UniProtKB/Swiss-Prot annotation:
Assigned keywords, A-Z: Repressor, Ribonucleoprotein, Ribosomal protein, RNA-binding, rRNA-binding, Translation regulation, tRNA-binding
GO molecular function: rRNA binding; structural constituent of ribosome; tRNA binding
Protein's name in the database: Large ribosomal subunit protein uL1
GO BP annotation list: regulation of translation; translation
SUPFAM superfamilies (UniProt xref): Ribosomal protein L1 (SSF56808)
Function: Binds directly to 23S rRNA. The L1 stalk is quite mobile in the ribosome, and is involved in E site tRNA release.
Family: Belongs to the universal ribosomal protein uL1 family.
Keyword rRNA-binding among record annotations: yes
Example of a GO cellular component annotation carried by this entry: cytosolic large ribosomal subunit
Length: 231
């Protein structure tokens, strides 16, 4: 524990908590502070100028990160007939209907993303209490309920991330790994922020993207000076 404490203390000493860092410096700091023995994820937290308690200001969606997430994704698809074949051809690991539903009910969930064709929702709808709490329930708002299951599978494999604002009005998402080049992290962050801007509720007033901070799994948070994002 002493070694961990010393490492954390050393990392905290490198970052001024109240300072807003230029994007390039912020990403370099985060990578430098990601000193665990595994390839830490690089995460972003975005404080939005919304009232998360209002139903018309819930921000939710998905975006395919141009540099991917650095994570291998296993995809399960509810589809039948031709769409099932298309899902398999696109790379889905598991494709089924009632058989897949029974597998899930039995607790066998060896997948990271669930995609469903609209005509399968009579089966998928019975799994809400199982998939919902795990963030796996297919939803048209994030592109996981769609007639084009093949494209949805390819997007999931290519590095699509889903986002949803929490009760505090903050979006949390992963934009890569410590092993990523800064340019890759920067392009992924830009793609996420662009998706968030497009998802801005019409009823949201004032500054929308209020604060942005990046961190690693075991590292400290670094605030970003938004004026440098377009640099």
């Amino acid at each position: 524990m002493a070694k961990i404490s010393k490492r954390v203390a050393a990392n905290k000493a490198k970052v001024e908590r109240t300072k807003f860092y230029p994007i390039d410096e912020a990403l370099s700091l985060v990578k430098e502070c990601a000193s665990a023995k595994f390839d830490e994820s690089i995460d972003v937290a975005v404080q939005l100028g919304i009232d998360a308690k209002k139903s018309d200001q819930v921000v939710r969606g998905s975006v395919v990160l141009p540099a991917g997430t650095g994570k291998s994704v296993r995809v399960a698809v509810f589809a039948q007939g031709e769409k099932a074949e298309q899902a398999k051809a696109a790379g889905a690991e598991i494709v089924g209907m009632e058989d897949l539903a029974e597998q899930i009910k039995a607790g066998n969930m060896d997948f990271d993303v669930v995609i469903a064709s609209p005509d399968t929702m009579r089966v998928v709808g019975t799994l809400g209490q199982i998939l919902g709490p795990r963030g796996l329930m297919p939803n048209p708002k994030v592109g996981t309920v769609t007639p084009d299951v093949a494209t949805a599978v390819k997007n999931a494999k290519a590095g699509q991330v889903q986002f949803r604002v929490d009760k505090a009005g903050i979006i949390h998402a992963t934009i890569g790994r410590r092993s990523f080049e800064p340019a890759a992290l920067k392009s992924n962050l830009a793609a996420l922020l662009d998706a968030l801007s497009k998802a801005k509720p019409a009823s949201s007033k004032g500054v929308y993207l209020r604060k942005i901070a990046v961190s690693s799994t075991m590292g400290v948070g670094v605030r970003i000076d938004q004026a440098t994002l377009s640099a």
